Amino acid sequence: MDRKFHLCLLLVILGTIIVQGAPLENENDADPDKPQKYRYYLKRATTEKKDNDPAKPGCHYTPFGLICF
C-alpha cells in the first residue's frame, strides 16, 4: 500500500513539474520581460543579432549569459 501511494505521489509531482514548464501561449506572444519563457530566450539567442554585438563567432546569448563554443 505504501509503495503504491509513494509511486502515485511521485508521478503526480513529476507530471506537475512537466506541465508547469510547458508554455501555455503561442511562442509569438512571449513577453521578453518574463524570464520563465525559456524557449523564447533560446530561440532569440540563436537568431537575434545586434549591431554592436560584442559576441565573437561561435558565441551565443542565452538566459545564463554569453556562451562561447
From Swiss-Prot:
The keyword Metal-binding belongs to this UniProt entry's keyword annotation: no
Subcellular location: Secreted; Nematocyst
Positions annotated as propeptide: 22-57
Superkingdom of source: Eukaryota
GO cellular component: extracellular region; nematocyst
Keywords: Disulfide bond, Nematocyst, Secreted, Signal
Annotated S-S bridges: 59-68
Tissue expression as described in the entry: Tentacle (ecto and/or endoderm tissue), and possibly also nematoblasts.
Function: Peptide with unknown function. Has a limited effect on human peripheral blood mononuclear cells. Does not show activity against both Gram-positive and Gram-negative bacteria nor is it active on the 26 voltage-gated ion channels tested.
Extra information: Shows a propensity to bind albumin in aqueous solution, which opens up the possibility of using it as a carrier for directing albumin binding as well as potentially increasing half-life in serum. The peptide is found in two different conformations which could be explained by a cis-trans isomerization at Pro-63.
Protein's name according to its UniProt entry: Peptide Hact-1
Leader sequence residues: 1-21
